[in-house]
Amino acid sequence: MLYYKNKEGSMEYLESFRFAAYDQEYAFRLDEKRTCFDSMYPFFTLSGRGLEELTTGALTILYGGNGSGKSTALNIMAEKLSLQRESPYNRSPFYEGYLKLCSYDLLEKVPACSRIITSDDVFDYMLHVRALNEGIDIRREEVFRDYLTDKYGQFRFTSMEDLDKLKRVNKARSRTLSKYTRERIAHNVREYSNGESGFRYFTDKIGEDGLYLLDEPENSLSPSRQMELSRFLLDSVRYCGCQIILATHSPYLLAMEGDRKSVV
């Protein structure tokens, strides 16, 4: 079962979103000529759970068990609304056909900064920082070796072809190892714990005046970080002109204030 609850706030862009109704999906299936697929995902995923329309508020929370359709609903909305996303989404051959059957009502134009943020985005970010720093560390060792070779090795200038080498030697001999290294490579990107990195990712990506869809943002966050994230999201809604729609299992995020609650 998929549920949702809303919190009224100061700024809303999306008023409601209509997913494909069962009769529309059934008509599409009757007209579909391709028979080589085992699944027509996302067809019948949401209508089979009774979700054909979602009325949104300034803060809308989707919750339910695994497989209830939370992530599917958010991804369909993000694609239909042309929101920014980082990690690629695995679309099925029937995705475009499904999107054509969806519609929505806006209260305000959706800002260009609006985006969907998924668990994959956060994990990819942490892996990227780690890989970047590993690359910098390897490059630093190479620079150390170059410095020692240029500073203390034997060198004779014999032709203009040696000019670049002469410049490197002079630079090494006129600088300390630390200064020589800083000039040639970037600084490491600061790494935090997984929980702090995840929390910082959300605070970096969620700005002012935007529509943000969050898919299980509690992943990788400790209970204390989940509570901190809930306060940040509420402040973003109340004071920063944000509309937020999120799917979650977290009791800390589910505990955020909601003015109405519906079972669908």
Regions found by a protein language model. Give the residues of each.
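N-terminal pre-Walker A segment at the start of P-loop NTPase domains
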Residues: 4-51
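Phosphate-binding glycine-rich loops of NTP-binding sites
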Residues: 57-91
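Conserved ABC ATPase signature
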Residues: 66, 116, 135-228
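Flexible phosphate/Mg2+-sensing switch loops adjacent to catalytic phosphate-binding sites
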Residues: 81-110
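Loop/turn-to-beta-strand initiation segments
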Residues: 208-211, 237-245
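Helical segment within the ABC ATPase nucleotide-binding domain
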Residues: 227-238
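H-loop/switch region of ABC-family ATPase nucleotide-binding domains
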Residues: 247-249
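Conserved small/polar residues in nucleotide/adenosyl-binding loops
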Residues: 263
